[in-house]
Amino acid sequence: MKLIIICGATATGKSETAIALAKHLGAEIISADSMQLYKGMDIGTAKLSVDQRDGVAHHLLDVLEVHEDANVAWYQERARKLISEIHSRSKDVVVVGGTGLYIKAILDDLNFPDTDPEVRKSLNALAEKIGGDAMFERLEKLDPGAALAIDKANLRRVIRALEVIEITGKPFTANLPRKDSTHFPDAQQFGLVMDRETLDQRISNRVDEMWQKGLVQETHTLLSSGLREGRTAQLALGYAQVIKFADGLISEADAQEDTKRATRQYARRQETWFSRDERIRWISPTQPRLETIISHLRNSQSTRAALHE
C-alpha cells in the first residue's frame, strides 16, 4: 500500500490536491498541520469543512481542545498508528500539510532527549527576562536550520529546541536523520510551489477572507473555551494577532496586516525547510498537479516491479 506526502508552503493548494489524489486512489488523508489538530480553530487554520472534504476520510483534525498541547513525539505515535491501521484495510494514505517537522517525524526516526527540568526552568526564566524575540535570535545563532522549522511566535518550541541543544551539546537539527526514511522507505513526497508574487497575493486574499468569515468572533469564542491556557494554540497565526487586538495592544487593521506579514514569513521558512529534503519531487505551477503525481506514482511502481523481477 502507498504512503504519499503532499507538502509545501501555506496557501499553495495542498488540501485540494490531496483530496483529488485521495479520490483517485480511494485513499484516506492524514493531516500534518500542527494547528488543525485543535477543535474550533477552523477559520484561522483554513481547515476544510466536512462538505469540502468531498467524502474523503480525514484524520488528525479536531482531536485536541485548545487548552491541550501536542508535540512531535505525540504526533508521530498517532500518525504512524493511523497509517498502519489504514494500510491494514488495504487503503492508501495521503499525508498533507505544511508542518515539516511532523512530516519528518512520520518518515524518519527522530531521537530527541527527554526534558531536563532544570534546563527547562532556566530557559523559561531567561525567556521571561529577555522575551520571545531574543530567544528566537538565540536559536538562529545556535542552529539556523532549527529556526527555519519553528514558528518564531511559538516560544514553547523555541525553548524546546534550545533545551535539546543545551542537553546534547549539538544543534537541534543534528538529531534529525540525514539518510532516507528508515520507517517508510517507499513513501513518496510531492511538494507544491508557486512564484513569490502569486503566493503572497494568495496569502493576502486568504487572510482577508478569514476576517470576512469571522476570525475575530471565532477567536473570542475560543478564548472563552480556554485558548489562553494552551501554550501552543494561542500562538497560531491569526489567533495570536486577534488576541493582541482583543487585549487592546493593537488595532484590528494592524492585527489583519500583521497576520499577512507573519504568514508570508512563515511561508518563506516552510519553503526553505522543504527545499532541504532531496526526496521531495517538486511540482511547478505550470504542471497539472494530479496528473503529474499519478504519472510519477505509476513510473515508480513500474521501476520497483522491474527491480524485483
Describe these PLM feature segments:
Residues 1-309:
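Phosphate/pyrophosphate-binding catalytic cores of soluble transferases and nucleic-acid-acting enzymes
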